[in-house]
Amino acid sequence: MKIALGIEYDGCRYCGWQRQQYVDSVQQRLEEALSVIANSSCEVFCAGRTDAGVHATGQVVHFDTDVNRPMQSWCLGTNAHLPEDIVVKWAIGVSDDFHARFSALARRYRYVIYNNKLRSAILPKGISHYHYSLDHEKMHEAGQFLLGENDFSSFRAAKCQSHTPWRNVHHLIVSRHQDYIILDIQANAFVHHMVRNIVGSLIEVGRGDKPVEWIKWLLEKRDRTLAAPTAKAEGLYLVEVIYPEKFSIPQMPLGPLFYYGK
């Protein structure tokens, strides 16, 4: 039997999604909790391996099991054995041809910047703070150069293990909601650090240090050393994974919890 789960987590105190020796990970905590409910070991496969400090409101995973439990048990029972910063939002049975990663058509991320001279005391680790005034309209305009299928070598981490830097960006929207600037980006997939590297360079445009056309120039140069530093992990959320309709994967509010924009 194959089961898919929707997962939400605060990534602040984890080394990232992927299980690693000697450090705490979201995958490890989830597998340990599921193993209690299954009374046997469980291995999960995720849609997107988030980095250390990165959050998710729409992570999707799957696992195989021979144990027959009500879906409610896989959800509520697992939650009873998880730390408070990880939660299973839903559980459904899926067909054998479903794979959380390889069946996905697209992933969607949001990056949240608190753009105020003073830092926030309420959400210090759920947002990225930038104290210089940013022009979100210029950031949005610059981001449109990244739409479509392109070589994202300029926005790719040096240690990226992907075989190709080519990705197809479906949309990139930068909007302001009072002191919050939200970057919303969807693509078929992302190279390592792609969203945070894009944000870092768009901040240069928003601050006025670089022209809008600089982003187009960076894309064409295909050279990571020419782009801005990587933006902090704290502001990044995996908010949605899109699948073919035949799998009937539940659609949840995109989040993060303090922001429910369209």
Swiss-Prot record:
Reactions catalysed, as given in the entry: uridine(38/39/40) in tRNA = pseudouridine(38/39/40) in tRNA
GO BP terms: tRNA pseudouridine synthesis
Record keyword Secreted present: no
EC number of this enzyme: 5.4.99.12
Residues holding substrate: Y109
CDD domains to which the protein is assigned, alphabetical: PseudoU_synth_EcTruA (cd02570)
Pfam family, one: PseudoU_synth_1
UniProt keyword annotations, A-Z: Isomerase, tRNA processing
Domain of life: Bacteria
Protein family (similarity comment): Belongs to the tRNA pseudouridine synthase TruA family.
Function: Formation of pseudouridine at positions 38, 39 and 40 in the anticodon stem and loop of transfer RNAs.
This protein's name: tRNA pseudouridine synthase A
Organism: Glaesserella parasuis serovar 5 (strain SH0165)
